[in-house]
């Protein structure tokens, strides 16, 4: 079984040559506002626009800044509003089955704190740094120091929302995962772990 690890690791998919995400397609309430926010706040660049047949809406593509990864947005003339806890992440962090809970962007660990301050300076409401800790079962460890952590914190995260209410995350891996990180059986639809 493969594991997630910091960029540049040697994990290989031998089944398919998946090179990353081509794009992720989301739905915008207001295309103009959405494009402006992603360009002005996150620095992405609009690279492709199209009108959908029959006046149904629009489909726009933004490049994340590396010429490869992108985010696309649909705008539909009669799209229903998102529902927290169903199509959007609810106040308790849950969302419905088959929906996207949040979108995490990989950022350099050495720029993590700087990027949080940069978002705040742009008027974005950002959470405190969440240091996901093994010793706290994924819970938050309030203080993080790479020199003294000893591998307890596995990812650092900050969360914020785009104009459509989509929860976004800036995340940086702080350790490479190994076999010791695979300690839980997956739950079934009934909430019980699968037995071997």
Regions found by a protein language model. Give the residues of each.
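Vicinal oxygen chelate
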Residues: 2-5, 19, 31-32, 86-88, ...
């Amino acid at each position: 079984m493969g594991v997630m690890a910091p960029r540049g690791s040697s994990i290989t998919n031998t089944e398919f040559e998946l090179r990353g995400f081509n794009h992720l397609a989301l739905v915008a309430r207001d295309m103009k506002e959405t494009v402006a926010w992603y360009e002005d706040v996150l620095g992405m660049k609009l690279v492709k626009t199209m009108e959908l047949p029959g006046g149904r809406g629009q489909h726009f593509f933004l490049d994340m800044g590396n010429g490869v990864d992108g985010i696309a947005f649909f705008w539909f003339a009669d799209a229903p509003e998102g529902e927290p806890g169903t199509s959007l992440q609810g106040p308790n962090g849950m969302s419905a089955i088959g929906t996207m809970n949040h979108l995490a962007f990989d950022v350099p660990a050495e720029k993590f704190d700087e990027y949080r301050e940069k978002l705040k300076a742009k008027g974005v409401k950002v959470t405190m740094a969440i240091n996901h800790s093994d010793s706290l079962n994924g819970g938050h460890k309030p203080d993080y120091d790479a020199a003294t952590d000893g591998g307890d914190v596995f990812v650092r995260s900050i969360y914020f929302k785009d104009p459509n209410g989509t929860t976004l995350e800036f995340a940086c891996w702080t350790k490479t995962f190994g076999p010791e990180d695979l300690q839980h059986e997956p739950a079934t639809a009934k909430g019980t772990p699968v037995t071997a």
